[in-house]
């Protein structure tokens, strides 16, 4: 109930602010769709790259593997879902088709697919099994459907060499998307990667109009952060400058953008591979690496999409499963139990902690239902003697800011919004004593 009341109060405050400024009223800032809000809440997803190149040792499928050797005989969708849960993730993105064009579902568009595998006598369906397992475990499912298709002669973005070839491939790709959305949905997010030229918006509008389209040429999507290292810049705004039909281009976003299109950080648990290779366990990112990535993505308000690499048998290797669990456990250890927490409206929000406790982190979150409004803020701590001292300054808050600083003993914390694009609603202000190593790059103190 309090969330509904708080949301209504925020809308009332925004209307009052508009009336107070007089003259030409500013445009109301963009706000996320309900689907985007759910995506923000998930914060962490797991990517799963599996294709025939796991039998070849390369990053791209050269189509040299005999079809009777493409045999994920130990694939268990429940194990993949367990990996998602262990990592503390809320969704998965499955690469149902990568650049080679191999389709991991029962498609009518090509024989270069799982239906020509000996697995389950050609009746196996990785995507179908994952869809059922995700529904059962309440994990949201998304799909990467690569526009490039070497089998069909379509290059980057789905671009064919001749007009007649382009028309033929457009029909194939649109049919593949239709099959996925019709037979395996609902989908949480569709990954099209950058530069897709195949017209698909009408298919999405007909079958799944609210879906999050990564790098899609449509509103209500998500965008690439600009690197594959798992690090977001700071600030990394949730809005961009966008025109209908364009692919999102602003990795860091823009505070005055006209479209809500948040960034997603993708990175593989293997360096530098997106796909499994023999003997790759030694290249799994360390727990220290993963925690740094978490601070530099989720800790900057950006979703993290962490890639796992199932092997040639379709199984997530035990070493990766163990590291994913370590990662999830470490995040929970750090941030599951705040010393104190509060929420509220306005430019000043105080949090009483007690009779002087040591803290080294503050987490701040805006209520994104009314948009992203904070433009500059500072966090202060009140020492036991009553003196307020500045702990850190920042610009963006957005979905979440994990703000570390040197350990200090305080009785209270105060958030002061110094600049904003309208009345501010803070959904969370929490103080923590993490007392664990913090990545150097996570510390910041804006002017």
Predicted feature descriptions by range:
Residues 1-6, 84:
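Positively charged n-region of N-terminal signal peptides that target proteins for export
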Residues 6-16:
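Bacterial N-terminal signal peptides
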Residues 23-406, 416-435, 445-446:
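Mature catalytic domains of secreted/periplasmic carbohydrate-active enzymes
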Residues 410-414:
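Short, conserved beta-strand segments of beta-strand-rich sandwich/propeller modules, principally
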Residues 436-440:
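Intrinsically disordered, low-complexity Ser/Thr-rich linker and spacer segments
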């Amino acid at each position: 109930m309090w969330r509904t009341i708080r949301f209504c109060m925020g809308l009332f405050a925004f209307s009052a602010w508009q009336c107070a400024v007089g003259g030409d009223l500013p445009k109301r800032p963009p706000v996320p769709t309900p689907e985007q809000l759910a995506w923000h809440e998930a914060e962490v997803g797991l990517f799963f790259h599996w294709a025939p190149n796991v039998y070849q040792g390369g990053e791209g499928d050269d189509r040299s593997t005999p079809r009777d050797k493409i045999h994920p005989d130990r694939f268990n969708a429940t194990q993949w879902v367990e990996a998602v849960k262990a990592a503390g993730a809320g969704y998965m993105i499955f690469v149902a088709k990568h650049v080679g064009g191999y389709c991991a579902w029962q498609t009518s568009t090509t024989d270069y697919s799982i239906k020509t595998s000996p697995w389950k006598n050609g009746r196996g369906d990785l995507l179908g099994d994952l869809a059922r397992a995700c529904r059962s475990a309440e994990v949201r499912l998304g799909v990467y459907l690569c526009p490039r298709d070497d089998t069909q002669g379509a290059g980057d973005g789905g671009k064919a060499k001749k007009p007649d070839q382009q028309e033929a491939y457009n029909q194939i790709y649109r049919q593949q998307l239709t099959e996925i959305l019709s037979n395996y949905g609902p989908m949480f997010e569709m990954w099209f990667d950058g530069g897709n030229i195949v017209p698909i918006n009408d298919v999405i509008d007909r079958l799944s109009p609210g879906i999050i389209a990564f790098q899609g040429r449509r509103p209500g999507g998500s965008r690439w952060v600009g690197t594959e290292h798992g690090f977001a810049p700071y600030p990394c705004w949730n809005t961009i400058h966008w025109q209908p039909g364009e692919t999102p281009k602003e990795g860091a976003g823009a505070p005055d953008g006209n479209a809500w299109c948040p960034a997603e950080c993708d990175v593989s648990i293997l360096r530098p591979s997106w796909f499994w290779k023999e003997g790759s366990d030694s290249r799994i990112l360390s727990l220290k690496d993963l925690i740094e990535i978490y601070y530099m993505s989720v800790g900057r308000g950006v979703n993290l999409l962490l890639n796992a690499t199932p092997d040639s048998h379709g199984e997530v290797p035990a070493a990766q499963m163990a590291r994913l669990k370590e990662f999830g456990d470490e995040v929970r250890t750090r941030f599951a139990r705040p010393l104190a927490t509060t929420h509220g409206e306005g430019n000043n929000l105080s949090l009483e902690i007690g009779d002087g406790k040591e803290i080294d982190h503050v987490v701040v979150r805006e209520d994104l239902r009314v948009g992203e409004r904070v433009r500059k803020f500072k966090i202060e701590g009140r020492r036991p003697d009553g003196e307020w001292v500045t702990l850190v300054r920042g610009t963006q808050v957005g979905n979440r800011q994990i703000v570390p600083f040197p350990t200090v003993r305080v009785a209270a914390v105060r958030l002061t919004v110094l600049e904003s694009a309208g009345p501010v609603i803070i959904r969370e202000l929490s103080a923590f004593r993490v007392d664990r190593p913090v990545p150097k790059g996570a510390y910041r103190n804006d002017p």
